[in-house]
A protein has these predicted regions:
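Basic, amphipathic "hinge/linker" alpha-helix immediately C-terminal to the N-terminal HTH DNA-binding motif
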Residues: 85-106
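Short loop/turn motifs at secondary-structure junctions and domain boundaries
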Residues: 16, 84-85
């Protein structure tokens, strides 16, 4: 069970509260692409990643969908969008501090996926 922190007190979440929390989570990071984008950015934190690079590296995502997903992730404060001041401005994307809190979740999903693939191909 999860825990709820409120007014300095911690209590165990009810089943209904846990299900609501899962719905909230899936609303923000669910779908086909958001977790992939977050994991991609997490694995490349030392690089400057622009839209074109992300589009090239994450196979199968359309330009229109990538733009929408990046906007959604930025709106939910999971990624940062930074524009340089060069003559030809470039925009770079990275995980925000808050977005880094999703890294353990993506790691768990990756491991589960690897384990599952091994299990079904035995």
């Amino acid at each position: 069970m999860g825990n709820i922190k409120k007014n300095g007190n911690i209590r165990e979440a009810s089943c209904d509260e846990e299900l609501r929390a899962m719905r909230d989570c899936l609303f923000i990071i669910g779908g086909k692409w958001k977790l992939l984008i977050l994991r991609y950015l997490a694995n490349r934190q030392h690089l400057e990643l622009n839209y074109t690079k992300i589009l090239q590296d994450i196979g199968g995502i359309s330009p229109k969908v990538l733009i929408k997903e990046l906007k959604d992730l930025e709106q939910n404060q999971l990624i940062c969008r930074k524009q340089n001041n060069d003559k030809v401005p470039k925009v770079f994307y990275s995980l925000s501090g808050y977005g880094k809190t999703v890294i353990p979740l993506t790691e768990a999903i990756v491991q589960w996926g690897l384990d599952h693939r091994s299990k079904i191909t035995e």
